[in-house]
Amino acid sequence: EDVDHVFLRF
């Protein structure tokens, strides 16, 4: 899971 990465994308 890359949940923390999704937030960085925004």
UniProtKB/Swiss-Prot annotation:
Name used for this protein in its record: FMRFamide-like peptide Sa12b
Sorted UniProt keywords: Amidation, Ion channel impairing toxin, Neurotoxin, Proton-gated sodium channel impairing toxin, Secreted, Toxin
Entry-annotated residues carrying Phenylalanine amide: F10
Function: May be directly involved in a paralyzing effect, by inhibiting muscle contraction, or may also act centrally to modulate prey behaviors. The non-amidated form (Sa12b) potently inhibits ASIC current in rat DRG neurons (IC(50)=81 nM) when preincubated before activation by acidic pH. Has no consistent action on the time course of desensitization or the sustained component of the current. Has no activity when coapplied with acidic pH, suggesting that the peptide needs to interact with the channel during its closed state.
GO MF annotation: an example: toxin activity
GO cellular component: extracellular region
Post-translational modification (record): Is either amidated (Sa112) or non-amidated (Sa12b).
Organism: Sphex argentatus argentatus
Compartments (UniProt record): Secreted
Superkingdom of origin organism: Eukaryota
Tissue expr: Expressed by the venom gland.
Similarity section: Belongs to the FARP (FMRFamide related peptide) family.
Chief location category: secreted
